[in-house]
């Protein structure tokens, strides 16, 4: 959530920065007017309270004065009406504020969509095959790794059921990701069901209510990302400065409606309603956030280096970043069978945007004041997508898939062949 006071005192600056994030001028103006209306009512309440205090003193001096008693009664009724109006105005103002995204860091390029993203680096060589490589969904069918039909029977479209070696490979991928960061990040195992407050804290609600699965007749939701659980572990808490920075990680399942994915590639294991990933979350002082983002992104990249899969790093433009992000790097792997790059990680600094919503603070030793922390989150990595990338990158002319060296210690096989 943006700082109300900074917004009020820098309207032109915030209008420019928010328009760069895709906010319409009318949406911004609606918030400004709602905030003004709320403050006007608050001022009227303050004046009425002052008048009520004076009236009380006068009534005490002139006991039983009918005129003063009537005036006091009318003022009391007016105050009640003003307080009701203020609560309504405050609710509207808060709702509109919660729907405004974070503003971009000055280092972020301005742009509408992914075409304005900047490619910063490439690692690894794209494989050269002496045959036509297959996309992962065809390999899944030929090697009987994913029972797409059974998953559809169990649930519906865009769910998958991994079989035997595929299930073991998925578990191995998750283990490698956790193990590579276990000395730096504290591991958690958290619920997959979260409440409205947690989703509001990290920014999924209220704006993206159509993208999350809500449990019927409850205020609970299936979590769309482990960022929600890990970031909200310290909601309404105050760190000592010495406790920062804190690094957390978790692996688990996530659920998304993917309401805006019409027309996008939905074959295979890339874009699912239920998916698995390893998440990294950091809490630090705001002045250290950008440095911590660089470190987090390198932590995610290290996994790809271990797996020896070619990838690139992108700096996302203002219009392509997530709602809560201040600055974001995406990591995309080369999908040899699809002949394209696909995202497997998104690492973001959110500044104090989420901390302000979730009330996560630290005691600043210099000022003695409670100050909002900065939060960061990153996928390290998307497990189903890495599974797909391994199939495409390590496929052979014989129709087999070799297991990357980094995963062999977790498995009792070194290649996947078609079952007899």
UniProtKB/Swiss-Prot annotation:
Protein name as annotated: Serine--tRNA ligase
Keywords: Aminoacyl-tRNA synthetase, ATP-binding, Cytoplasm, Ligase, Nucleotide-binding, Protein biosynthesis
Pfam families assigned to the protein according to its UniProt record, in alphabetical order: Seryl_tRNA_N, tRNA-synt_2b
CDD domains attached to this UniProt entry: SerRS_core
Top EC category: ligase
Domain of life from the UniProt record: Bacteria
Family: Belongs to the class-II aminoacyl-tRNA synthetase family. Type-1 seryl-tRNA synthetase subfamily.
HAMAP family: Ser_tRNA_synth_type1
Residues involved in L-serine binding: 225-227, 279, 379
Molecular function terms from GO: ATP binding; serine-tRNA ligase activity
Described purpose of this protein according to its UniProt entry: Catalyzes the attachment of serine to tRNA(Ser). Is also able to aminoacylate tRNA(Sec) with serine, to form the misacylated tRNA L-seryl-tRNA(Sec), which will be further converted into selenocysteinyl-tRNA(Sec).
The UniProt record lists the keyword NADP: no
Originating gene: serS
Compartments reported by the entry: Cytoplasm
Catalytic activity as recorded in UniProt: tRNA(Ser) + L-serine + ATP = L-seryl-tRNA(Ser) + AMP + diphosphate + H(+); tRNA(Sec) + L-serine + ATP = L-seryl-tRNA(Sec) + AMP + diphosphate + H(+)
């Amino acid at each position: 959530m943006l700082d109300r006071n900074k917004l009020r005192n820098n309207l032109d600056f915030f209008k420019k920065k928010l328009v760069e994030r895709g906010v319409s001028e009318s949406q911004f103006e609606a918030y400004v007017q709602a905030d003004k209306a709320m403050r006007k009512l608050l001022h009227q309440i303050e004046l009425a309270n002052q008048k009520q205090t004076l009236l009380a003193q006068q009534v005490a001096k002139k006991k039983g004065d009918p005129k003063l008693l009537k005036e006091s009664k009318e003022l009391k009724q007016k105050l009640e009406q003003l307080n009701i109006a203020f609560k309504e105005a405050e609710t509207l103002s808060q709702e509109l504020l919660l729907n405004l995204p974070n503003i971009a860091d000055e280092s972020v390029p301005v742009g509408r969509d992914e075409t304005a993203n900047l490619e910063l680096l490439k690692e690894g060589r794209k494989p050269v095959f002496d045959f036509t490589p297959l996309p992962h969904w065809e390999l899944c069918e030929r090697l009987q790794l994913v029972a797409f039909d059974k998953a559809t029977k169990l649930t519906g479209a865009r769910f998958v059921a991994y079989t035997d070696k595929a299930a073991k490979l998925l578990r191995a991928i998750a283990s490698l990701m956790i193990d590579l960061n276990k000395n730096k990040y504290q591991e958690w195992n958290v619920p997959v069901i979260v409440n409205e407050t947690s989703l509001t804290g990290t920014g999924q609600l209220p704006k993206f209510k159509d993208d999350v699965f809500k449990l019927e007749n409850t205020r609970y939701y299936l979590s769309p990302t482990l960022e929600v659980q890990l970031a909200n572990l310290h909601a309404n808490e105050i760190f000592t400065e010495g406790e920062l920075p804190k690094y957390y990680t978790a692996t688990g399942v996530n659920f998304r409606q993917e309401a805006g994915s019409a027309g996008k590639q939905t074959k295979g294991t890339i874009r699912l309603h239920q998916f698995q990933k390893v998440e990294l979350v950091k809490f630090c002082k705001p002045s250290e956030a950008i440095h911590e983002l660089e470190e987090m992104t390198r932590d995610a990249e290290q996994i790809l280096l271990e797996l020896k899969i070619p990838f690139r790093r992108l700096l996302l433009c203002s219009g392509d970043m997530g709602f809560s992000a201040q600055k974001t790097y995406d990591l995309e792997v080369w999908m040899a069978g699809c002949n394209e790059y696909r995202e497997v990680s998104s690492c973001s600094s959110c500044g104090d945007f989420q901390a302000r919503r979730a009330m996560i603070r630290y005691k600043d030793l210099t000022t003695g004041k409670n100050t909002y922390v900065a939060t960061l989150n990153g996928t390290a990595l998307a497990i189903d997508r890495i599974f797909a990338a391994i199939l495409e990158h390590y496929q052979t002319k014989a129709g087999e898939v070799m297991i990357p060296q980094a995963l062999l210690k977790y498995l009792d096989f070194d290649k996947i062949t078609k079952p007899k």
